[in-house]
């Protein structure tokens, strides 16, 4: 095992973290689950169901018109309640009303085994058989690719596969604890992942928290230590197998890996994931088990501080750095790749001469505030930006939090100007939205770089 030390970055210590024991004893199965278009950029669905249809767990809901063979399946049994579309008929979400029996059973129905399932170990199967089973079951959608951050194309073969067993985002659950006791599923899953590439399979974990997956000729364990983004797949790929046009890498996380292993072992993957529910407004942060795509409208309600209405809280699917607001019947659901739900206080206040305050409770990457010399502790972060958008000033803040070997200020400028050629020269193909979350947080100009990055990536992909 090699140890990789990350020097640049920033850990945001936020109040409201769940207990560190990693136990997720509580199960929450909501009345609705959904598949969200925002999870699959560039995907164009070909619908296989319509509103009112009854579906069982594992039934095909739609396929990707742009990538034939990639199927998106129902996470739980129920009835298709609605299919929502936006401007120019862009797919936004498909909502399933969960069967009462499914809810009473804790979302544990096995569904139907794929026709290609044999119960044999992946080592005894051909590469093509492994791919067909993943596609038929819908588990293929757990695999994402760099560059571009799309669901992997089954017609291609990556240079390497990354199994991510660490997460350094604020309030994130420990991926190793989330799959504790599932050594067999992890071993079968790693064997299946090795069938997807002729190159190495990297198992990336935090130093001292190794994932119990066997090491082999092509399965290599790598340990990372340091501040965020030390626990992101993008940085692991950047360090171990950098991507560019024609050189892909695929990645998936530990819980999806265990689900794939269970699929090959039993004929059915997991409908549930361990999810962290955290944030300063919560009186009882917790680790929960919840289905993929769970409705978040009432998910955090039992744990909010008394006396606060929903308008004063923002529920975020994912990390506070790279997640998205999740509310309402259209998009108020847990994202496919999100393992945490973050709740923050809405802060619309404007502080007169706030920049003159000592900032004893401020969360900042600079040393301009008193908090930088006080003992490190978790702080009550809100949604406030402490100012409006302004011009970029390259004072070194960006480079301080940019762990990639990319000139951060130049990258930010290229993204905002949509200078496609310059962005590609700088290495934008190695990034997706979560990789620029710290740039947004640290930006003195209050810019959000994730949408700008996605526009640049879409243009690069379209132009080939």
Language-model features: locations:
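Buried, small/hydrophobic-residue-enriched core segments of structured protein domains
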Residues: 84-298, 302-464
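Short coil-to-beta-strand transition motifs
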Residues: 69-77
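Short, well-structured beta-strand-loop connectors
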Residues: 49-63, 81-82
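Short, solvent-exposed loop/turn positions at domain surfaces
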Residues: 43, 49, 66-69, 284
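N-terminal, Lys/Arg-enriched amphipathic/low-complexity engagement segments
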Residues: 1-50, 221-224
